[in-house]
């Protein structure tokens, strides 16, 4: 029999053994938990994020399925970081003030990121049509806020259409109608209009927003003005999106608009990713075979072209172009739409070269249908419609080039850049309309750092004003394009200021409207000389002025230029100048209330009719 001491030792040994087992089991459990935690943590931190776009296979039977797939890929935003670990470490570095914040300017860079004669006059309606808008192309009429017949002046005064008689001092308002109200809609932009060739219909174009579902539309409405004292709404049509530009050609209204895809709405409703035409509640999508899209989208915005009958607003055809969403130029045969983007190239030593590129796509409209006929890729960007011109089967284009080089650094899920350098210049291209090949051109003809500020084509001639706006000096170039592929050119040399608009003024003269070295108004007359382009005379005034070309009165027959101004010394005025072959003379400055952008004027016989916030008839001016 064990003694008490032996029994006590035995119990102590058992307790010690149990404690060791507990410690071992606890260690095993702890180790297991740690291993499990590491596995879970690794799964949480290092498992890659899913970078696959959402599944859209449920729409495979849709005629738009191919387009849906491309839109889905273009609108899907991949995770910025590879996994949670990269996200957390980047956030910690940012908190500490490390990483890209101390590495120069940070930015995300993604390759491919977006950039005949006059119509015949007709003797019906409210008179004979008379053109008052200085259209870029003869017979391709542009919208404005002033139109006229031989009997009446049609003025779009903000949201009211007003009709005045042309009767010198007896001119008077004979009819008006509110055109700013659309049932259930809010107008979001200024309105513009057309007058039909028989002077019986005014067409109003505006952007509007539905008060019900906040859908944006381009609203086109026609008004019967046969009786100016009783103006009546005669029709309307809507296109989803917002307006870019429009033209009226031979009784057809060419409406150019843009529509942005609502990627947050998915593809269940066509209205979220397709432009539509009709009336609210009865809209029809542009057909799938009328939509042109590049294989890789650089934009989720359409340019939409709708061809309408100008009288009844019936749709003749429609087409949409994904990614073509910048400038619009319309010739007698084609609509040209531009798409600008950045072309990125990797160089040695971590350097990156980014060039601004522009794709110009041509759409034929003369057959009564809209048909894509080709496109061309050019270096640089197109400033506006006047930088493009189709003549004799050749598309002439002036672009402003921009090359940027920088060193790129990547780390912690961020992209940083340093040592940024920019080169700018101007190119002239001549493109064959047969195969869209470049058949002639002049590259980098301007002083380094300058861009094209104004361009004007006139038959075989081209005029280009380049400037470095910060310096405020400008050469004006004259190009002879009559013997392609040979191109010859002359320039004025350096002139103080620069022209924001160049205008053929007739009889070999060129009119420049722009700024002097003090950023005030400068109007200059140029002419071609044996050794270059010479300045004949200029007129300068300490005043601000409109840069809206449609606001200028250009009378080539009488060498008259008119525009609204706001002198620094007083209120708004309308300036009227005449060139006598030697100098520009003020022949009648008139006080006129309103913004220079919306001032308009027209000369009929020897009287001038002025429109601002008020109407004035003044004469005789000669």
Per-region residue spans from a language model:
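Beta-sheet-rich non-transmembrane sensory/scaffold domains
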Residues: 51-622
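Single-pass transmembrane signal-anchor helices and their membrane-water interface zones
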Residues: 7, 11-15, 31-53
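Short secondary-structure junction/hinge motifs that connect adjacent elements
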Residues: 23-33
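Disordered, charged N-terminal biogenesis/targeting segments of membrane/secreted proteins
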Residues: 1-25
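N-terminal cationic amphipathic segment used for targeting or macromolecule association
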Residues: 6, 10, 35-41, 103-104, ...
């Amino acid at each position: 029999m064990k003694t008490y001491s032996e029994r006590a030792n035995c119990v102590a040994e058992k307790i010690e053994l149990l404690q060791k087992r507990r410690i071992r089991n606890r260690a095993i459990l702890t180790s297991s938990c740690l291993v499990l935690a590491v596995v879970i943590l690794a799964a949480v931190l290092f498992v890659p994020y899913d970078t696959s776009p959402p599944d859209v296979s449920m729409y495979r039977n849709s005629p738009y399925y191919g387009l849906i797939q491309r839109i889905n890929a273009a609108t899907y935003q991949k995770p910025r970081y590879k996994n949670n670990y990269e996200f957390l470490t980047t956030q910690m570095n940012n908190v500490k003030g490390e990483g890209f914040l101390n590495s120069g300017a940070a930015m995300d860079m993604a390759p491919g990121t977006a950039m005949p004669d006059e119509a015949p006059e007709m003797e019906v309606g409210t008179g004979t049509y008379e053109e008052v808008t200085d259209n870029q192309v003869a017979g391709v009429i542009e919208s404005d806020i002033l139109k006229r017949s031989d009997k009446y002046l049609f003025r779009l005064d903000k949201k009211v259409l007003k009709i005045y008689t042309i009767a010198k001092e007896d001119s008077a308002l004979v009819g008006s109608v509110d055109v700013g109200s659309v049932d259930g809609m809010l107008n979001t932009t200024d309105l513009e209009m057309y007058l039909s060739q028989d002077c019986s219909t005014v067409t109003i174009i505006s952007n509007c927003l539905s008060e019900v579902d906040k859908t944006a539309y381009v609203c086109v409405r026609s008004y019967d003005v046969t009786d100016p004292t009783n103006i009546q709404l005669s029709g309307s049509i809507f296109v989803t999106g917002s307006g870019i530009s429009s033209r009226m050609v031979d009784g057809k209204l060419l409406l150019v608009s843009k529509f942005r895809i609502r990627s947050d709405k998915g593809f269940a409703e066509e209205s979220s990713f397709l432009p539509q035409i009709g009336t609210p509640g009865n809209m029809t999508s542009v057909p799938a075979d009328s939509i042109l899209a590049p294989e890789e989208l650089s934009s989720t915005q359409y340019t939409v072209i709708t061809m309408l009958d100008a009288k009844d607003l019936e749709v003749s055809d429609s087409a949409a172009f994904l990614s073509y969403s910048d400038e619009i130029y319309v010739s007698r045969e084609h609509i040209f739409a531009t798409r600008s983007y950045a072309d990125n190239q990797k160089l040695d030593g971590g350097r990156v070269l980014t060039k601004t590129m522009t794709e110009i796509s041509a759409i034929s409209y003369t057959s009564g249908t809209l048909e894509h006929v080709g496109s061309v890729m050019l270096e640089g960007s197109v400033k506006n419609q006047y930088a493009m011109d189709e003549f004799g089967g050749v598309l002439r284009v002036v672009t402003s080039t921009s090359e940027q080089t920088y060193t790129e650094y990547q780390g912690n899920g961020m992209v940083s850049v340093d040592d940024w350098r920019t080169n700018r210049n101007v190119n002239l291209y001549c493109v064959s309309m047969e195969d869209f090949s470049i058949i002639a051109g002049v590259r980098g003809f301007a002083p380094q750092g300058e861009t094209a500020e104004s361009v004007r084509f006139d038959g075989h001639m081209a005029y280009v004003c380049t400037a470095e706006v910060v310096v405020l000096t400008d050469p004006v170039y004259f190009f002879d394009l009559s013997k392609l592929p040979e191109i010859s050119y002359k320039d004025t040399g350096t002139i103080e200021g620069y022209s924001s608009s160049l205008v053929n003024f007739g009889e070999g003269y060129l009119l420049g409207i722009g700024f002097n070295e003090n950023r005030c108004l400068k109007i200059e007359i140029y002419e071609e000389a044996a050794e270059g382009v010479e300045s004949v005379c200029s007129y300068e005034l300490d005043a601000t002025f409109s840069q809206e070309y449609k606001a200028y009165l250009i009378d080539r027959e009488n060498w008259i230029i008119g525009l609204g101004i706001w002198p620094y010394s007083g209120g708004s005025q309308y300036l009227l100048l005449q060139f006598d072959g030697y100098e520009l003379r003020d022949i009648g400055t008139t006080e006129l209330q309103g913004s220079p952008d919306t001032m308009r004027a027209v000369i009929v016989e020897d009287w001038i009719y002025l429109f601002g916030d008020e109407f004035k008839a003044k004469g005789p001016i000669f």
